[in-house]
């Protein structure tokens, strides 16, 4: 913490007690006043715009126009049949009960303030379940939000007339925003929903005061920009029909509104807009879970939350402590964000019902005027323990990087209901799996480099294919390609050598295929020359065999020639030799047919003569035949001949 003499405690007076409502004195003429005119239809709106009134503000989602007008113009507008009603532009103030006390400027990141308020609401259990308010949009309608290292502001809007900036010039809005969403960065404070998208909607001025016109503008902006939750740590003691209509409109559009009950003390009526049924009214509790002395109570109070001595972010990178239902309200708004993250599809009604399951009942049993349904307190669900187990498994996988631990974590994650928390766990595990995949690929490439077998190469290639495109994949593929080239070269050499030895066509074809896979090189050229010699030898052998068969047309020579021709690769030479050999085969076949006819004649003669001489002659003719069905038949006939004695 930055050293301060006598421990600097600066009081910044922000609190303005809730004022008795009346017309604002902003008009230049005492006969003029600021009013909100609510119209029934388009004609009513045109009537307002065409009147003598000065238009201050038009709204996108509210049928109203804020104007400054004299009494006569206001009277005319009230009497117009297309005008629904006219209301005075009344004032609002921030709902603080004490002055802020500045603690530190936060320049020393070792600052880590005590936050008693987190324990009663058990929010750490929600964090363990992965609930951080991620993707939930929260509008803080307040004095704006000041830039702070402990805050992330998603955007904002200024509804006040004196500046277009939504930067906080009071401190109240920044304090509220920190309670909701201060970062979990190891210093300062921890917000209840640190990953919620916080929007600064400036409707209060540097004194913490505002008016109905600006508040309506803030609500209108929240509807237009699809806020999930609106925090209103402000209020007034008088009812407003247009404000009531505005919050109802927002509620119907799916915006959950949370507001401070007020700081007028027990027994005083709940302030507006918290008093409306479409708004969640929040009272404040102290360190002893008792009602804060300043907290307004009433039937409208729905929940209570810590609101005394709350430390949060402040102007100029400082931190400060403050008390009020202003501080209690953001506790509830942030808790709603956690519940909304857990069940994004739930309606406002369902969320309010769900919050009733996440309370500890204080005071009279059931709902009462002081605490409503009770103090908000996160209740762990069965899914929380499942999430915790999955997260623990992911942590183990992150530490060990073992595939068995990765698989176990993935199985546990798969059993979780769909949520941002589940997606976050998946992303963490995907990083571990990516690391593991790279390591596996490196190990398998190294193994392929060592053993240089096709199996190790195939295994390494499969591992590389799992990697995303990038430097690791590119470098590993280069290394594996070198191994592939080595193996391809060795295979080509071995196959060429085998072809040289066997001269078989299958070996020659295999060698040719292996050579074809090699990149152009002197080695490839040399291997091709060696293989071409084998092909030339086979061609010469086939040519000689065919010539021999042509010279002496025997079955044996024809068969030998056919075997030699079969070893040749397809081409003109093989085709020409096969044609020559086919002629030889026809000649051999003709000679064989002649022998068959001769044998048939002699067998027939032996059957007729039945002499030993004719049978011997027939047997000699049959013996000269090639094995065939015809030869078998002739032999059976001859065997049946019994020579005469």
Curated annotation (Swiss-Prot):
Active site (record annotation): 142 (charge relay system), 172 (charge relay system), 326 (charge relay system)
Sequence ranges of Polar residues compositional bias: 522-547
GO molecular function ontology, one term from the record: serine-type endopeptidase activity
GO BP, one annotated term: proteolysis
Primary enzyme class: hydrolase
Protein's UniProt keywords contain Cytoplasm: no
CDD domains according to UniProt: Peptidases_S8_Subtilisin_subset
Removed propeptide positions: 28-103
Effect of gene knockout: Disruption of the gene abolishes swarming. Mutant lacking this gene does not show significant decrease in CSF production, but the triple deletion mutant aprE-epr-vpr is defective in the cleavage event to release mature CSF.
SUPFAM superfamilies assigned: Protease propeptides/inhibitors (SSF54897), Subtilisin-like (SSF52743)
Signal sequence segment: 1-27
Impact noted for substituting residue 326 to A: Loss of protease activity, but mutant is still able to swarm
Modifications after synthesis and translation: May undergo two steps of processing in its passage through the cell membrane: removal of the N-terminal signal sequence and cleavage of the C-terminal domain. Several active forms of Epr with molecular masses between 40 and 34 kDa were found in the medium of B.subtilis cultures. The size variation of the active forms expressed by the complete epr gene appears to be the result of partial removal of the C-terminus either by processing or degradation.
E.C. number(s) listed in UniProt: 3.4.21.-
One GO cellular component term noted in the UniProt record for this chain: extracellular region
Pfam families linked: GA_3, Peptidase_S8
Disordered: annotated span: 490-577, 591-645
Inhibition and activation profile: Requires Ca(2+) for stability. Activity is inhibited by phenylmethylsulfonyl fluoride (PMSF) and EDTA.
UniProt KW keywords: Cell wall, Hydrolase, Protease, Secreted, Serine protease, Signal, Zymogen
Cell compartments where the protein resides: Secreted; Secreted, Cell wall
Compositionally biased residues, Basic and acidic residues: 491-508, 592-610
Record remark on domains: Contains two domains, a large N-terminal domain encoding a serine protease homologous to subtilisin and a smaller C-terminal domain that possesses unusual sequence features. The C-terminal third of the protein is not required for protease activity but is required for swarming.
Protein function: Serine protease. Involved in the production of the competence and sporulation stimulating factor CSF. In addition, is essential for swarming motility. Plays a key role in DegU-mediated swarming motility. The protease activity is dispensable for swarming. Not essential for growth or sporulation.
Similarity section: Belongs to the peptidase S8 family.
Protein name as catalogued: Minor extracellular protease Epr
Gene: epr
């Amino acid at each position: 913490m930055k050293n301060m003499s006598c421990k600097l405690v600066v009081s910044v007076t922000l609190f303005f007690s809730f004022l008795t409502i009346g017309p604002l004195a902003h008009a230049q003429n005492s006969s003029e006043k600021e009013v909100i005119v609510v119209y029934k239809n388009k004609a009513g709106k045109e009537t307002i715009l065409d009147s003598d009134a000065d238009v201050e503000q038009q709204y996108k989602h509210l049928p109203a126009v804020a104007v400054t007008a004299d009494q006569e113009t206001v009277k005319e507008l009230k009497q117009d049949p297309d005008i629904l009603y006219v209301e005075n532009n009344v004032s609002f103030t921030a709902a603080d009960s004490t002055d802020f006390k500045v603690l530190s400027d936060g320049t020393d990141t070792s600052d880590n303030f005590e936050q008693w308020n987190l324990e009663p609401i058990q929010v750490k259990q929600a964090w363990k379940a992965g609930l951080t308010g991620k993707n939930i949009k929260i509008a803080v309608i307040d004095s704006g939000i000041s830039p702070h290292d402990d805050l992330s502001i998603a955007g904002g809007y200024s509804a006040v007339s004196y500046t277009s900036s939504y930067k906080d010039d009071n401190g109240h809005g920044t304090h509220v925003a920190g309670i909701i969403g201060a970062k979990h960065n190891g210093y300062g404070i921890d917000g209840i929903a640190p990953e919620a998208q916080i929007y600064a909607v400036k409707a209060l001025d540097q004194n913490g005061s505002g008016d109905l016109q600006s508040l309506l503008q803030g609500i209108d902006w929240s509807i237009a920009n699809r806020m999930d939750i609106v925090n209103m740590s402000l209020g007034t003691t008088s009812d407003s029909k247009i404000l009531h209509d505005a919050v109802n409109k927002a509620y119907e559009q799916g915006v959950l509104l949370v507001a401070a009950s007020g700081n007028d003390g027990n027994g005083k009526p709940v302030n507006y807009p918290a008093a409306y049924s479409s708004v969640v009214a929040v009272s404040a509790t102290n360190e002893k879970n008792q009602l804060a002395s300043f907290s307004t109570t009433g039937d409208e109070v729905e929940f209570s939350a810590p609101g005394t001595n709350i430390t949060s972010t402040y102007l100029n990178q400082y931190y400060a402590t403050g008390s009020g239902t202003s501080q209690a309200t953001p506790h509830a708004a942030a808790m709603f964000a956690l519940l909304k993250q857990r069940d994004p599809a739930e309606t406002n009604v369902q969320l309010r019902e769900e919050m009733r399951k996440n309370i500890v009942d204080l005071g009279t049993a059931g709902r009462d005027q002081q605490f409503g349904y009770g103090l908000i307190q996160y209740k762990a669900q069965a899914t929380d323990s499942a999430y915790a187990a999955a997260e623990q498994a992911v942590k183990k996988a992150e530490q060990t990087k073992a595939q068995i631990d990765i698989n176990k974590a993935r199985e546990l994650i798969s059993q979780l209901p769909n949520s941002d928390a589940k997606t976050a766990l998946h992303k963490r595990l995907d990083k571990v799996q990516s690391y593991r995949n790279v390591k596996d690929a490196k190990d398998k490439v190294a193994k392929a480099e060592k053993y240089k077998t096709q199996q190790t190469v195939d295994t390494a290639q499969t591992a590389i294919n799992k990697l995303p495109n990038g430097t690791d994949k590119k470098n590993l593929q280069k290394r594996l390609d070198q191994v592939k080239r080595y193996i391809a070269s060795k295979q080509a050499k071995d196959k060429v050598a085998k072809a040289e030895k066997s001269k078989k066509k299958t070996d020659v074809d295999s060698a040719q295929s292996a050579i074809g896979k090699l990149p152009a090189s002197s080695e490839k050229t040399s291997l091709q020359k060696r293989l071409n010699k084998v092909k030339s030898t086979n061609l010469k052998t086939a040519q000689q065999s065919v010539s021999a068969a042509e010279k002496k047309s025997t079955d044996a020579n024809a068969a030998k020639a056919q075997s030699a021709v079969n070893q040749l690769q397809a081409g003109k030479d093989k085709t020409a030799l096969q044609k020559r050999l086919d002629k030889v085969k026809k000649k051999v076949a003709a000679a064989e047919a002649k022998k068959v006819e001769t044998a048939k004649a002699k067998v027939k003669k032996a059957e007729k003569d039945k002499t030993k001489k004719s049978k011997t002659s027939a047997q000699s003719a049959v013996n000269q035949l090639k094995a065939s069905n015809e030869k078998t038949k002739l032999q059976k006939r001859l065997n049946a001949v019994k020579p005469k004695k």
